[in-house]
Each structure stands twice: as C-alpha cells, then as structure tokens.
C-alpha cells in the first residue's frame, strides 16, 4: 500500500500532527476557539500591514499625507487600512478572552505554554503601540512622547535610555523611522513565538473545561474542531467587517485626524481602548516611578498565576468562591478601562485608585485564599 503523503512527508507530517490528526479532548467548548482566531488575526494583520507598508512613507513630513493618500487614491486602500486598524482591536479582544479562558480553566498550570503566551501578549502590546505612532497624528505623536518618557523614571540610566530610544532629544524623524522598522519586524517575532507556544501546548495536549486528564477520550482535530473553528472565524469576521465598513473610526481618537504638532498638546492624552486598563493603573499612582512599576506589574502579574494556584482542583468550574472573584476581577478591569478614558479629575482619580488596588489585591491575595478555603470546605 502506498504511504500516505500527509503522514510521511517531513513537512506535511508536522502540519498533520498539529492541525489534522492532533488528538483533542472531545469536550472543549467554544472558549477554546480563540487560539485559532488569534492565528487568523495575526495572518490578516501581517497581510494588510504588508499592503499598507508598500504605500507608507516613514518620514515626519510625509507620514500623515501618505496614510491619507492610501485611503483616497489606492485601490481599496481605505478598506485595507480600516481592516488593519480595527483588526488590531479584534486581536486584543481575542487575546483577552483567550487569557480569561486560560485563567478560568487553570490552563496556566502548563507553565511553559502560559509563560510563552504572556511573552506573546507583551510583544503584541509593543507592536500595537509602535503601530499607533505611524499615522503621525496628534494622538500618535503625544502617545509616543508620553509612553516613551516613562522610561526616564528608571533610576540612573532612565534619561539616557529615553534619548537613545528617541534617537534625539524629542520624538522626531528618527523615532518614527525606528518605530516603523519595529512595527514591521515584531509581527514576525510574534509568528515565531506562536510556533514555540504551540510546540509547548502539543507536548502536554489541550486542557479541557473539567480540568481532568482526557487521554481516554480524544478525537482528531480535523474535521471536528477545524469545522468548529471555521464557525468561530465567521463569527469574528462578521463584526470586524461590519465595524470596518460602517463605522471604521468608532474606536479611534478624533485627535488623530490632526497632523502631529509638537507645539499643541491635546486636552486628553489617552491610548487605544485595549491599553486603557493599564493606563488607568499607571495614572492612579501619583509618583512617576511607582506608576511605571504598577503599569509593568499589571501585565507581568500573569507570570505569577501558576504560583498563586492553591486549589486542588484545576478549573473554576466547581469552585463558586473563585468564580465570584473571577467575575469581580472582570468587572474591575472594565471599570479600569472606563476610568482610563476619563480626564484626571474627581471622582475618577479615587475610582481608579480603588480599582487598581482591588485588581492587585484580588489576584495576589484573594484568589489564593479562596483556593485554600475551597480545599478546606471539600475536606481535601
């Protein structure tokens, strides 16, 4: 009998073992769709980004007008740009839901997979930040100025580091050029890290909603989950195309329709919606270095999840106390996102400070206590 090329060819064999014959737990829910959706988001962002890069000029005098030219004069340039800008928002929606699912179902106990995932999140955040600077509008320029300036809070080397990042004494042409280079490079780094992430995942196999070993009941990925993922894809593309075609600027800042002007500061400098929770935590601390440390901690705290797991059960499916805390944390993040979009005045300052405190308190103290308490209640 002739060998099946899918199983014998050195390259196809790898694809087969990852996407076709991959043994998958039979009970994984729709929450497990977001991994493949993130892969599709990345592919789409790289393709649309590549097409945009062919028409973009990384120069302070030309960047703004080159983006306008893309939207006005290039065939479907407006569509490519709208898909790219809003695709970033959907990328973050998917990654936040993906992390939330991992947190709820205890997927962080696969430490290598979880840690590479957190590194992926950090790389994605860096990519989105440098990308937001490229259109060289007012919010692009001032966002770049404010966020890069945070590095000056680092003792002793801070100021040198900032000027090195800027390539001068302020955000100017060298900054834009290097940000474009980074924005082009980082998505490919994300693609490479994704392969590492998947390699670690396929070492252990997927987790499942019950959090139990599922070796006794696994089914092939294709056709069951490939079809399920296509359904997820259509449900992602529908709101994305709706947003890109009907209201492409809904999530953007009107300030970015004004070309960058170093002499005029916008009344409210704020990042895109997906960074607002971290921005609110940064602003809630009056000290500059303290704010920067809290900002870094708000994301780096994810690395501690495996260490803070005290429950004998893996998932939160049968842990009502932890469930309550999980949804409190979700509401807390939504409050932080809202506060981050508001001006720095009463009552938003105190709300932001309380929400920031609750965020860290819940993750670092309440979750481990709840896990230990649930063990005790179940006589473990």
UniProtKB/Swiss-Prot annotation:
**Protein's recorded name:** Cytochrome b
Required cofactor(s): heme b
User: Matching Gene3D superfamilies, A to Z?
Assistant: Cytochrome Bc1 Complex, Chain C
Identify the GO cellular component terms for this protein.
mitochondrial inner membrane; respiratory chain complex III
InterPro entries in alphabetical order: Cyt_b/b6_C, Cyt_b/b6_C_sf, Cyt_b/b6_N, Cytb/b6-like_sf, Cytochrome_b, Cytochrome_b_C_euk/bac, Cytochrome_b_N_euk/bac, Di-haem_cyt_TM
Gene Ontology biological process terms, A to Z: mitochondrial electron transport, ubiquinol to cytochrome c
Q: Which family does it belong to?
A: Belongs to the cytochrome b family.
A single GO molecular function, which one? Answer: metal ion binding
UniProt: heme b b562 binding residues: 84, 183
* Subunit structure of this chain's protein: The cytochrome bc1 complex contains 11 subunits: 3 respiratory subunits (MT-CYB, CYC1 and UQCRFS1), 2 core proteins (UQCRC1 and UQCRC2) and 6 low-molecular weight proteins (UQCRH/QCR6, UQCRB/QCR7, UQCRQ/QCR8, UQCR10/QCR9, UQCR11/QCR10 and a cleavage product of UQCRFS1). This cytochrome bc1 complex then forms a dimer.
Cofactor note (record): Binds 2 heme b groups non-covalently.
Report further notes.
Answer: Heme 1 (or BL or b562) is low-potential and absorbs at about 562 nm, and heme 2 (or BH or b566) is high-potential and absorbs at about 566 nm.
Q: What does this protein do?
A: Component of the ubiquinol-cytochrome c reductase complex (complex III or cytochrome b-c1 complex) that is part of the mitochondrial respiratory chain. The b-c1 complex mediates electron transfer from ubiquinol to cytochrome c. Contributes to the generation of a proton gradient across the mitochondrial membrane that is then used for ATP synthesis.
Per the record, membrane topology reads: Multi-pass membrane protein
Provide the transmembrane region boundaries: 34-54, 78-99, 114-134, 179-199, 227-247, 289-309, 321-341, 348-368
Q: Which UniProt keywords apply?
A: Electron transport, Heme, Iron, Membrane, Metal-binding, Mitochondrion, Mitochondrion inner membrane, Respiratory chain, Transmembrane, Transmembrane helix, Transport, Ubiquinone
Q: Which organism is it from?
A: Ciconia ciconia
Protein location: Mitochondrion inner membrane
Record's superkingdom?
A: Eukaryota
Q: What CDD domains does the record tag this protein with?
A: cytochrome_b_C, Cytochrome_b_N
Write out the residues that bind heme b b566: 98, 197
- Residues binding a ubiquinone, per UniProt: 202
């Amino acid at each position: 009998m002739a060998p099946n090329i899918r199983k014998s060819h050195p390259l196809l064999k790898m694809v087969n073992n990852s996407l076709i014959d991959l043994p998958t737990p039979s009970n994984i829910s729709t929450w497990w769709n977001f991994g493949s959706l993130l892969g599709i988001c990345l592919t789409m962002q790289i393709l649309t980004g590549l097409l945009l890069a062919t028409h973009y000029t990384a120069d302070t005098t030309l960047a703004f007008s080159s983006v306008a030219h893309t939207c006005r004069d290039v065939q479907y340039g407006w569509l490519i740009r709208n898909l790219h800008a809003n695709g970033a928002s959907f990328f973050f929606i998917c990654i936040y839901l993906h992390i939330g699912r991992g947190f709820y179902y205890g997927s962080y106990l696969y430490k290598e997979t979880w840690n590479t995932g957190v590194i992926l999140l950090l790389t994605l955040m860096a990519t989105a930040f440098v990308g937001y600077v490229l259109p060289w509008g007012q919010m692009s320029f001032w966002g770049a100025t404010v966020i890069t300036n945070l590095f000056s809070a680092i003792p002793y080397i801070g100021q040198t580091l900032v000027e090195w990042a800027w390539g001068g004494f302020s955000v100017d042409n060298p900054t834009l050029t290097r940000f474009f280079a980074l924005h082009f490079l980082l998505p490919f780094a994300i693609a490479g890290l994704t392969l590492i992430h998947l390699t670690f995942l396929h070492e252990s196999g997927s987790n499942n909603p019950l959090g139990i070993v599922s070796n006794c009941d696994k089914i092939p990925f294709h056709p069951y989950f490939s079809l399920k993922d296509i359904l997820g894809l259509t449900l992602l593309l529908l709101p994305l195309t709706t947003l890109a075609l009907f209201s492409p600027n809904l999530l953007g800042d009107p300030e970015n329709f004004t070309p960058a002007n170093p002499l005029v500061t916008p009344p409210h400098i704020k990042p895109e919606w997906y960074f607002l929770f971290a921005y609110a935590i940064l602003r809630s601390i009056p000290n500059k270095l303290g704010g920067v440390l809290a900002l870094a901690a708000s994301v780096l705290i994810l690395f501690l999840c495996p260490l803070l797991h005290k429950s004998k059960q893996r998932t939160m499916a049968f842990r009502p106390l932890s469930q309550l805390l999980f949804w409190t944390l979700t509401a807390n993040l939504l409050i932080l996102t809202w506060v981050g979009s508001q001006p720095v005045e009463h009552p938003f300052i105190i709300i932001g400070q309380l929400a920031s405190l609750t965020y860290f308190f819940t993750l670092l103290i309440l979750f481990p206590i709840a896990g230990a308490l649930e063990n005790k209640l179940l006589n473990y």
